[in-house]
From Swiss-Prot:
Keywords from the UniProt entry: Menaquinone biosynthesis, Methyltransferase, S-adenosyl-L-methionine, Transferase
Recorded family membership: Belongs to the class I-like SAM-binding methyltransferase superfamily. MenG/UbiE family.
Source organism: Thermus thermophilus (strain ATCC BAA-163 / DSM 7039 / HB27)
SUPFAM superfamilies: S-adenosyl-L-methionine-dependent methyltransferases
InterPro entries listed in its UniProt record: SAM-dependent_MTases_sf, UbiE/COQ5_MeTrFase, UbiE/COQ5_MeTrFase_CS
Protein name in UniProt: Demethylmenaquinone methyltransferase
Catalytic activity: a 2-demethylmenaquinol + S-adenosyl-L-methionine = a menaquinol + S-adenosyl-L-homocysteine + H(+)
Keyword Methyltransferase: yes
EC number: 2.1.1.163
């Protein structure tokens, strides 16, 4: 599914979020770089947007982008080459990461965590590959907020977005999956508890009236 929508993935992210995803990603980068990490993993990197932002902001850091979809990675590599950025992109399974213990000082995930088949197992792997004192930053769509804004947002997210996304990408199934996966995703407090159970010290912030959320987990 993700491989099929790769060619228009970036365009759709910008259009369907009205450009807000770039602001959210920049905030995630700010939080990831607070501790001046030297080794950074961007997991579920997709076409590499966040990995490239990290490298631009921290040119002296080693940045690795990992994803399970080769077509996404191919686009990420082309983008890195075009921008003259040295980022290593590789294929990897989030539930069995091909890295030694403590390999990274920071791990970021933007809009990929909810696609993992086993959240607890993924968090265990993320904790394992982080060095002591390392930081995990998870940018995700929580379930839609309540109230009047939430009602309008649900109509857009469940009706308009799947139609437009399917029309532009040619894959209606992928953009029907998006709202379904968001509705099934843990609420911010539940994800915080899940990360804490994995050993992280956790805080989170809501963005754009709760449309997106960033969870920050520090490994002791």
């Amino acid at each position: 599914m993700f491989s099929e929508i790769a060619p228009r993935y970036d365009l759709l992210n910008r259009l369907l979020s009205f450009g807000a995803d770039l602001r959210w990603r920049r905030r995630a980068v700010d939080l990831a770089l607070e501790k001046a990490p030297k080794r950074i993993l961007d997991l579920a990197t997709g076409t590499g947007d966040l990995a490239l932002m990290l490298k631009e902001r921290a040119p002296g850091a080693e940045v690795v982008g990992a994803d399970f979809a080769p077509p996404m990675l191919a686009i990420a590599r082309r983008k890195a080459e075009a921008r003259g950025l040295e980022v290593r992109f590789l294929e990897a399974d989030a539930l069995a990461l091909p890295f030694p213990d403590g390999a990274f000082d920071a791990v970021t995930i933007a809009f990929g965590f909810r696609n993992f088949a086993d959240y607890e197992k993924a968090l265990g792997e993320l904790y394992r590959v982080l060095a002591p004192g390392g930081r995990l930053v998870v940018l995700e769509f929580p379930p839609p907020p309540k109230g009047a804004f939430g009602l309008v947002y649900r109509v857009y997210f469940q009706r308009v977005l799947p139609f437009l996304g399917g029309l532009i990408s040619g894959n209606f199934g992928a953009y029907r999956y998006l709202p379904e996966s968001v509705e099934a995703f843990p609420a911010p407090e539940a994800l915080k508890a899940m990360m804490a159970a994995a050993g992280f010290s956790v805080r989170y912030e809501l963005l754009t009236f709760g449309v997106a959320a960033i969870h920050v987990g520090d490994r002791p």
